[in-house]
Amino acid sequence: MGFKVKVEFLGGLDVISNKVREHSLKVPLEEGEATVKDLIELITKSIIADPKDIPVFIEDDTVRPGILVLINDTDWELEGMEEYVLESGDVFTFTSTLHGG
């Protein structure tokens, strides 16, 4: 049992997922609820291609500073951050705000 969510990597962050920007991800759920914290763990296990790239995305068990996180086009800080309970069809957008130039 479980459900699907969409995960997007923008602003150059797609380099951690073999340059694939959009992913449909099945969230396994046997009982209870899944949160963004669970989603972050799932992303590190199933989307990030090279374990060396995990620190590009994660720092101190959460999304690293400099990455804007949107849940259904709303800043995740307004949605409860890691505690947000996932729902089928949710869209999670991770955008790097750190650019060279």
Swiss-Prot record:
Pathway: tRNA modification; 5-methoxycarbonylmethyl-2-thiouridine-tRNA biosynthesis. Pfam families: Urm1 (PF09138). One of its GO terms (molecular function) is protein tag activity. One of its GO terms (biological process) is tRNA wobble position uridine thiolation. The modification 1-thioglycine is found at residue 101. Its main location: cytoplasm. Signal peptide: none annotated. GO terms for cellular component: cytosol. Belongs to the URM1 family. Acts as a sulfur carrier required for 2-thiolation of mcm(5)S(2)U at tRNA wobble positions of cytosolic tRNA(Lys), tRNA(Glu) and tRNA(Gln). Serves as sulfur donor in tRNA 2-thiolation reaction by being thiocarboxylated (-COSH) at its C-terminus by the MOCS3 homolog UBA4. The sulfur is then transferred to tRNA to form 2-thiolation of mcm(5)S(2)U. Prior mcm(5) tRNA modification by the elongator complex is required for 2-thiolation. Also acts as a ubiquitin-like protein (UBL) that is covalently conjugated via an isopeptide bond to lysine residues of target proteins such as AHP1. This is Ubiquitin-related modifier 1. It comes from Scheffersomyces stipitis (strain ATCC 58785 / CBS 6054 / NBRC 10063 / NRRL Y-11545) (Yeast). The lineage of its organism: Eukaryota, Fungi, Dikarya, Ascomycota, Saccharomycotina.
